[in-house]
Swiss-Prot record:
Keyword Ribonucleoprotein appears in the UniProt entry: yes
The encoding gene: rplJ
InterPro entries: Ribosomal_uL10 (IPR001790), Ribosomal_uL10-like_sf (IPR043141), Ribosomal_uL10_bac (IPR022973), Ribosomal_uL10_bac_type (IPR047865), Ribosomal_uL10_CS_bac (IPR002363)
Cross-referenced Pfam families: Ribosomal_L10
The name this protein goes by in its record: Large ribosomal subunit protein uL10
Source taxon at top rank: Bacteria
Organism expressing this protein natively: Legionella pneumophila subsp. pneumophila (strain Philadelphia 1 / ATCC 33152 / DSM 7513)
Stated role: Forms part of the ribosomal stalk, playing a central role in the interaction of the ribosome with GTP-bound translation factors.
Subunit structure: Part of the ribosomal stalk of the 50S ribosomal subunit. The N-terminus interacts with L11 and the large rRNA to form the base of the stalk. The C-terminus forms an elongated spine to which L12 dimers bind in a sequential fashion forming a multimeric L10(L12)X complex.
Keywords: Ribonucleoprotein, Ribosomal protein, RNA-binding, rRNA-binding
Family: Belongs to the universal ribosomal protein uL10 family.
CC per GO annotation: large ribosomal subunit
UniProt keyword Cytoplasm, yes or no: no
GO molecular function, one term: large ribosomal subunit rRNA binding
């Protein structure tokens, strides 16, 4: 389907706006995927907060110009789509990694975070990053553990005294002499 100039400009503006807010981007080859598989992938992407779009490579290059994803321009060859993570850097990587296991024809080409390109082999490291909520809960656990240990240490002398008094009381109650 050919786009007229106004439609092309609108696509470039939309992708540029999303790319400027995005944290990470993944480029993947969709050759061999069925329409149903792509529809399912798009549906899951919307649920995950990932912007997934098939755009002509020349338009994507224009949209990525002067963004941190300009480093992906060399990989925009052939039938590819872009997936932009808007909430967490690992969202798009995790989504596509899971789908690459299910749909073997989905080929992840590269990932970009912070202006650096990572190849498909390194995507597992980014996909395994915790979400923001998981990271906060782990941090809270790590911060809470020393405080709990300190409180237990402070309470131990009193508890030991109470146990000793209870043992003395039981011993005296057992021996009336």
């Amino acid at each position: 389907m050919t786009l007229n100039l106004a439609a092309k400009k609108a696509v470039v503006e939309e992708v540029t706006a999303v790319a400027s807010k995005a944290i990470s981007a993944v480029v993947a080859d969709y050759r061999g995927l069925t329409v149903n598989q792509m529809t399912q992938l798009r549906s899951e992407a919307r649920k995950s907060g990932v912007y997934l779009r098939v755009v002509r490579n020349t338009l994507t290059r224009r949209a990525f110009k002067n963004t941190e994803f300009e480093c992906l321009n060399d990989l925009l060859v052939g039938p590819v789509f872009i997936a932009l993570s808007l909430e967490a850097p690992s969202d798009a990587a995790r989504l596509l990694k899971d789908y690459a296991k299910t749909f073997e024809k989905l080929e992840i080409r590269a990932l970009s975070v912070g202006g650096k390109v990572y190849n498909a082999n390194q995507i597992d490291a980014v996909a395994s990053l915790p979400t923001r909520d998981e990271a906060i809960s782990k941090l809270m656990y790590v911060m809470k553990a020393p405080i709990e240990k300190f409180v237990r240490t402070l309470a131990e002398p009193h508890a030991k005294l109470a146990r000793t008094l209870a043992a003395v009381k039981d011993k005296k109650a057992g021996n009336p002499a």
